[in-house]
Amino acid sequence: MAPPSVFAEVPQAQPVLVFKLTADFREDPDPRKVNLGVGAYRTDDCHPWVLPVVKKVEQKIANDNSLNHEYLPILGLAEFRSCASRLALGDDSPALKEKRVGGVQSLGGTGALRIGADFLARWYNGTNNKNTPVYVSSPTWENHNAVFSAAGFKDIRSYRYWDAEKRGLDLQGFLNDLENAPEFSIVVLHACAHNPTGIDPTPEQWKQIASVMKHRFLFPFFDSAYQGFASGNLERDAWAIRYFVSEGFEFFCAQSFSKNFGLYNERVGNLTVVGKEPESILQVLSQMEKIVRITWSNPPAQGARIVASTLSNPELFEEWTGNVKTMADRILSMRSELRARLEALKTPGTWNHITDQIGMFSFTGLNPKQVEYLVNEKHIYLLPSGRINVSGLTTKNLDYVATSIHEAVTKIQ
């Protein structure tokens, strides 16, 4: 008799929640259905948007007979890496001028986080540092915990961030947790448009955060998934990163071009490394090359070419910033409209946090039972945490969503 399958004992894993939500939405025949769970931009017609500048650059690339499908270098397309790091740090960055910046092209922001985490587990502040505490915000994007765990870190902790009572930033809790963190701990920071809360520190608050991190010798690992997409202004959205450079920090910054270029399925990311001197950057990149080689060997070219072509051409860059502002402005408009409708309905509670928050997501303050009501009774799909994708709102579904939220809050405590 043949033995059972070698896979017979493999347990069924739980589905990834945000993707399951979208699958459930697609299967729902109800005409009123609204998807506020998806982590991607939508137009006012609820469609994905291919940026006009991306279409233009794709055509340009298709017509360029000098291009081929040869392997890229292990660390990626040099022009892309340079342009991406410059976008985060700014043209006048002292770190760039002093040649103490390196970049690694990655498979999206997640790939940048993973390569950075793998490197830190092996080489940060010595060797084999898997017992170094890694701090993530409470709450945070769920993949942060998973990526650092998969890299081998054994001590992942949270720092206070969201104050549910006031629906805003718990700055004092945040600072206290940093103050009490062991020296040389790694701290994951959202550069802008915090996911899932949409609440960002002000520049003055960032200065306080940097001050504590500096005297505790904490290592910043920025996650920058929304530059330009949060406020519509590239410089404003990179303020924290650039301030940390000015304060002399060494740090990593995982960049994603999924949102601000709409290149979700091209997996375009970059890990920017800022060090103290050029020599250390060369050493870091030499080790990252080894890690990339056994992870994805080398990255795909198409998305990187699109981003590099756009960022390096002044005319295309200007068009791109206009496209980004179009997306950011629509989201800001939907925030205002949702808040206005909830206040007009006299929905219990305060709703100013919707417009105080920034970026694609809003932490509504709805509890899991209210979310369950919206999903099951109203066919409005959102995460159990109450996080919504504001770009899932449109001029056509706003009234329905607002009255449904009003019902959920009024009926269910």
Swiss-Prot record:
It is an enzyme of class 2 (transferase). Its main location: cytoplasm. InterPro entries: Aminotransferase_I/II_large, Asp_trans, NHTrfase_class1_PyrdxlP-BS, PyrdxlP-dep_Trfase, PyrdxlP-dep_Trfase_major, PyrdxlP-dep_Trfase_small. Its cofactor is pyridoxal 5'-phosphate. L-aspartate binds at G39, W141, N195, R387. It is found in: Cytoplasm. Pfam families: Aminotran_1_2. The modification N6-(pyridoxal phosphate)lysine is found at K259. Keywords: Amino-acid biosynthesis, Aminotransferase, Cytoplasm, Phosphoprotein, Pyridoxal phosphate, Transferase. It catalyses: L-aspartate + 2-oxoglutarate = oxaloacetate + L-glutamate; L-cysteine + 2-oxoglutarate = 2-oxo-3-sulfanylpropanoate + L-glutamate; (2S)-2-aminobutanoate + 2-oxoglutarate = 2-oxobutanoate + L-glutamate; 3-sulfino-L-alanine + 2-oxoglutarate = 3-sulfinopyruvate + L-glutamate. Its EC number is 2.6.1.1, 2.6.1.3. Coiled coil: none annotated. GO terms for biological process: 2-oxoglutarate metabolic process; aspartate biosynthetic process; aspartate metabolic process; glutamate metabolic process; glycerol biosynthetic process. One of its GO terms (molecular function) is L-cysteine transaminase activity. The modification Phosphoserine is found at S149. GO terms for cellular component: cytosol. Belongs to the class-I pyridoxal-phosphate-dependent aminotransferase family. PANTHER family: ASPARTATE AMINOTRANSFERASE, ASPARTATE AMINOTRANSFERASE, CYTOPLASMIC. In eukaryotes there are cytoplasmic, mitochondrial and chloroplastic isozymes. Homodimer. Biosynthesis of L-glutamate from L-aspartate or L-cysteine. Important regulator of levels of glutamate, the major excitatory neurotransmitter of the vertebrate central nervous system. Acts as a scavenger of glutamate in brain neuroprotection. The aspartate aminotransferase activity is involved in hepatic glucose synthesis during development and in adipocyte glyceroneogenesis. Using L-cysteine as substrate, regulates levels of mercaptopyruvate, an important source of hydrogen sulfide. Mercaptopyruvate is converted into H(2)S via the action of 3-mercaptopyruvate sulfurtransferase (3MST). This is Aspartate aminotransferase, cytoplasmic. It comes from Pan troglodytes. The lineage of its organism: Eukaryota, Metazoa, Chordata, Craniata, Vertebrata. The gene is GOT1.
